[in-house]
C-alpha cells in the first residue's frame, strides 16, 4: 500500500506532462481531414507541419502555406477540382511527403525555396503549367510527375542521387535532361511524354531499373550498370546505343520500334536475366560483341541480318532466334548449342534460305541444325545429277531410225 501511495503521484505527474505536451504541439496533426478554407489558416500558423493531413473537396480555391518551412507530415491534396494555386514559397525541406492528385484546375505551385524532398508526387493535374523552383531540388528521394501541362523540368533536375523518379504522360515536355544525375538507387522511368522528347542522361552511371518509352533520342554515354531491369520500347529513334554499359542485373527488353535499325551494346559482358527483342520492324543489326553470359532465356525476332555475339560462352535458359533475313547465319549458335552451352530445353534458330542455297537444296527455311540442312541438300543434288546422267546416256541417230523403218516395211511385203 505504501508503494502504491508513493507511485500514484508520480504517474499522475507523468500523465499530466504528456497531456500538456500533446496540447502544446498544435502543429502535429494525426489523420486530419480538411475540406474548408478556414482550416488552412491553422496549418499556416506552423513553421513545421507533422502528422498526416488530407485536403479534399471543392470548398477551397487556393492554399496559402507560406509560413511553413519544414514538412514532416504527409500532406495529401486529393480530388480538389476548385483549387487553382498552391503557395509554399518558404518551404525548404520535405522530410515527409507532398502528394497532389486529381486537382484538375490547379495551375501553379510555388516551391521557390525548396531544396530537399523525400517524396513529391504530382499526378493528374492537366492544368498544372507553372512550377516555381528557383533554388532547385538538390536532394531527392522519390519524385513522380504524371499527366501535367508542364513544359520543362527546370528545378527538378539538379540532384545527383535519387531513389526513384517517374516522369510520364506529360505531353508538353519535349526535353528531359538530368545533367547532374549519377545514381538512381531504385528506378528511373521516362515514359510517354511528348512524342519528340529528347532524353539526356550523360552523367548517369548506375541505375536500379531503367525504363525508356516514346522518346525520339536517348543519350546515356556514361551508364555502366543497370542493377535490375532495362526496358526500351515504343521509341522513334533509328539507333540505340549504350556505349559503356557493362552489366544488367535482370532482364532486358527492347520492343515495338518502327524506325530502329541498329542496336549496340559493345561493352555489355553479362546479362543476369532474359533477353527479349520483338516487333522492331526495321531492325538490321544487333551488336553484343562483348557479351559472354546470359543467365536467362533468349527470345529475339525480326528482320535483322546480323546478331553479333562472338564472345558468348553460356546461355542458361531457352534460346529462340527467328530472323526474316536470308542473310542471317545460325552456324555460330548451332555450334554453341552442340557444345551444350545453351542449357535450356528448347533451342531454335531460323531464317529463310539464302537464294543461292535454296536453288541447290530446295529448302525455304534453315533451322540452324547442320544435319538437316546437309542431308536435304545432298539428296536434292544427287537426284538432280542422276536425272541429268540418265538423259545423257540416250543417243538418238537419224540413220538408225531410217534403217529400222525400211526393215519393217520389207518384212511386211
From Swiss-Prot:
Keyword Cell wall biogenesis/degradation (UniProt): yes
Bias (Low complexity): 356-390
Localization: Cell membrane; Secreted, Cell wall
Carbohydrate-modified residues: 93, 102, 172, 209, 222, 227, 279, 290, 306, 322, 382
Membrane topology: Lipid-anchor; GPI-anchor
Top-level taxon of origin: Eukaryota
Propeptide: 391-413
Keywords assigned: Cell membrane, Cell wall, Cell wall biogenesis/degradation, Glycoprotein, GPI-anchor, Lipoprotein, Membrane, Secreted, Signal
Keyword Cell wall biogenesis/degradation: yes
Gene Ontology CC, one term: fungal-type cell wall
Lipidation positions, renumbered (GPI-anchor amidated glycine): 390
Region (Disordered), start-end ranges: 347-390
A GO BP entry: cell wall organization
Induction summary: Expression is induced by growth in hypoxic conditions and by caspofungin and ketoconazole. Expression is negatively regulated by BCR1, HOG1, PLC1, RIM101, SSN6, and SUR7.
Signal peptide: 1-20
Primary localization class, coarse: membrane
Role, per record: Cell surface protein required for proper cell wall integrity and for the correct assembly of the mannoprotein outer layer of the cell wall.
Record family assignment: Belongs to the SPS2 family.
Record's protein name: Cell surface GPI-anchored protein ECM33
Record organism: Candida albicans (strain SC5314 / ATCC MYA-2876)
Amino acid at each position: 500500500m505504501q508503494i502504491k501511495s508513493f507511485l500514484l503521484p508520480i504517474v499522475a505527474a507523468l500523465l499530466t506532462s504528456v497531456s500538456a505536451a500533446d496540447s502544446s504541439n498544435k502543429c502535429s496533426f494525426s489523420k486530419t481531414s480538411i475540406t474548408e478554407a478556414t482550416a488552412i489558416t491553422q496549418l499556416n500558423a506552423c513553421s513545421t507541419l507533422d502528422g498526416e493531413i488530407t485536403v479534399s473537396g471543392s470548398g477551397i480555391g487556393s492554399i496559402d502555406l507560406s509560413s511553413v518551412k519544414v514538412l514532416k507530415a504527409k500532406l495529401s491534396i486529393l480530388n480538389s477540382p476548385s483549387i487553382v494555386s498552391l503557395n509554399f514559397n518558404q518551404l525548404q525541406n520535405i522530410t515527409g511527403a507532398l502528394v497532389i492528385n486529381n486537382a484538375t484546375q490547379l495551375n501553379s505551385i510555388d516551391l521557390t525555396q525548396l531544396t530537399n524532398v523525400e517524396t513529391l508526387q504530382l499526378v493528374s493535374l492537366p492544368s498544372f503549367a507553372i512550377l516555381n523552383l528557383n533554388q532547385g531540388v538538390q536532394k531527392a528521394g522519390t519524385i513522380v510527375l504524371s499527366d501535367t501541362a508542364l513544359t520543362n523540368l527546370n528545378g527538378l533536375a539538379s540532384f545527383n542521387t535519387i531513389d526513384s523518379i517517374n516522369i510520364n504522360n506529360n505531353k508538353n515536355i519535349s526535353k528531359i535532361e538530368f545533367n547532374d544525375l549519377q545514381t538512381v538507387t531504385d528506378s528511373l522511368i521516362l515514359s510517354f511524354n511528348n512524342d519528340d522528347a529528347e532524353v539526356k542522361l550523360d552523367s548517369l552511371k548506375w541505375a536500379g531499373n531503367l525504363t525508356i518509352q516514346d522518346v525520339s533520342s536517348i543519350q546515356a554515354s556514361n551508364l555502366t550498370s543497370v542493377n535490375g531491369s532495362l526496358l526500351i520500347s515504343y521509341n522513334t529513334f533509328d539507333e540505340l546505343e549504350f556505349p559503356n554499359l557493362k552489366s544488367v542485373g535482370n532482364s532486358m527488353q527492347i520492343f515495338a520500334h518502327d524506325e530502329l535499325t541498329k542496336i549496340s551494346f559493345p561493352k555489355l559482358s553479362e546479362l543476369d536475366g532474359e533477353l527479349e527483342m520483338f516487333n522492331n520492324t526495321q531492325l538490321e543489326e544487333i551488336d553484343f560483341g562483348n557479351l559472354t553470359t546470359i543467365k536467362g532465356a533468349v527470345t529475339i525476332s525480326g528482320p535483322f541480318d546480323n546478331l553479333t555475339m562472338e564472345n558468348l560462352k553460356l546461355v542458361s535458359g531457352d534460346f529462340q532466334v527467328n530472323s526474316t533475313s536470308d542473310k542471317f547465319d545460325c552456324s555460330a549458335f548451332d555450334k554453341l548449342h552442340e557444345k551444350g552451352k545453351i542449357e535450356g530445353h528448347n533451342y531454335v534458330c531460323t531464317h529463310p534460305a539464302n537464294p543461292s542455297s535454296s536453288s541447290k537444296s530446295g529448302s525455304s527455311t534453315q533451322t540452324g541444325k547442320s544435319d538437316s540442312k546437309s542431308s536435304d541438300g545432298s539428296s536434292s543434288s544427287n537426284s538432280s545429277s542422276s536425272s541429268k546422267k540418265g538423259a545423257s546416256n540416250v543417243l538418238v541417230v537419224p540413220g538408225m531410225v531410217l534403217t529400222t523403218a525400211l526393215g519393217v516395211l520389207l518384212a511386211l511385203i
